[in-house]
Amino acid sequence: MSPFRAAEAVAALLLAVLLTLLVGCGSRLPERAFETRPTANPSGGEPLRVGIITSATSPVGGQALTGPRDGARAYFDALNARGGLDGRRIEVETCDDGGSGVGNNACVHRLIDERHVFALVATTALNYAGAPLVAKAGVPDIGGQPLTPAYDTYPHLYGIYGSSAPRTGGKPGWGGTLYGGTEVYRWFEREKGARTAAVVSYNQAASAAYARLVSDGLRAEGYKVVDEQVDFALPNFRAVAADLRDRKVDLLFDAMDTHGNVRLCEAMEALGVRVDAKVTNVQNWSSSVARDYARAPGCLNSLWVTGSSRNHQDTGDPAVREFRAAMGQRPLSQWQLEGWAAAMWFTDAARSCLAGAGLTRGCVEEFLNRPEPYTARGLLLPVRFEHLARPPETRHTCLSVARWEDGRGWVGQGDMTENCATVPQLGYRP
C-alpha cells in the first residue's frame, strides 16, 4: 500500500476509539438518512447493485466517517444522470454498521446474501469483522478506507491506497507486520528545514503505541524528537504548550482525538506558542477545521495535512471541479473526494469488462490487479496491488500536501506527483 497511509489509517481508527471513550456515546442521525434511494429500472437493462458499508452512527459521531459514502453516492448519482453504466443504472445499497463487529457482520450478510450486491465500494468501517465473509464470497470491495488491517490481509479487498502485502487471508501484511514510510517527515525536513518535532499522546496504550511509531519515523529521518504525554483523564495541556515553546519545536504531531487537539491548541494560544507546522491527517482534511479551531487561530493557520489524493480545493484540476460540482453546496472533505474516486474506480473497471467479454467479478478484479497503476483521472497518487513475498526496505513515494490559510482554506503545496522521495520502510504491528 502507499507507505505511511496504513499507519495513518490505523491512527484514524485509534483517534476514533479515543473519542469514543471521551464522549461515551455519539450523536445518531435519523435512520432515513441511510435509506437506499429508490431507483427506476433503466432502459438499458437491470440495475447494477453495489453496496456501501459505513460506520455512520458509531459512537464517534454521525459525520465522522460518512465522507467516503457521500462522495461515492454523489459519483453514482452523476453517473446515473448521464445514463448510467452503458445504459444500466447503478443502484446503491447503503448499510450503517454502527461501528461494531456485530453490526458489520450484519451489513455484510444483508448486502451480499440478501441484496446480492455485485461489489462493495468505499467501505468505511471501524470494525471490519465481516471482511473474511466478503473474501469468502469473492465479492470485490473497492476503494475502502483501511481503518483496520483487513485491506492488507484478505483477497478481494482493495483499499483506496493500494497494497503490497500478499493478502492471503492469514496474518496482516507480512507475518503480522505492516510497513510505513517516512516520506512525511522527509518532506518537512527538505521543504521547511524542520529539525525538531514533538509528538503528543495520552498515557493510554493505543495512543502511546502510535506515538512511538511516529517518533521512530522522525528519528529515522534525523529529527530531534520531543515526546510529550498527558494524562488521559486530566490532561495538562498548558504544561505541554510551555515545553513546546522552551524546546523550540518546529513540527507538532499527535496521537490524540480532535477534542484533545483543540484543547492543546487553545493552551498554545493562551501562552502565545507557535510552531511552523501542526501536521494532521486526511481524516481532518475538511472545511470543518475552521469551526473546530475557532478559538485557536494561531494553531489553525499552522495546520498542515498530508495524504495520497489531490486537494479537494484544487479547482485548477478538471477532475476536482467535476467532484465539487456534483457535491453542490455541501461542506467538502478529502474523504468525500476519495469516496468519489472509489466509485470511479469501480465504474472504470466495470466499463472495461463491458467493452470485452462481459461483466463478471473476476473481470473487475483483473482490472484492479493490473500492473498499471490507477489514478482516478489524477485524483489519486498511483495505486497498485503487488502481492510481494517480502516487504520492501525502501520505496519511492509521493505525497499530497496542503496547509490551511484563512480566507483561502486548504492550499496545496506543490504538485503531489512531484513531492516525492525514496524513503525507508519501518515495520509496525497493528
For every predicted segment, state its role.
Residues 26-29:
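Bacterial signal peptide processing site
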Residues 117-229, 278-297:
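Extracytoplasmic ligand/sensor domains, especially the bilobed periplasmic-binding protein
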Residues 162-165, 267-343, 416-419, 424-429:
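Extracellular/periplasmic periplasmic-binding protein-like sensory domains
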Residues 327-336, 347-411:
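Segments of small-molecule ligand-sensing domains
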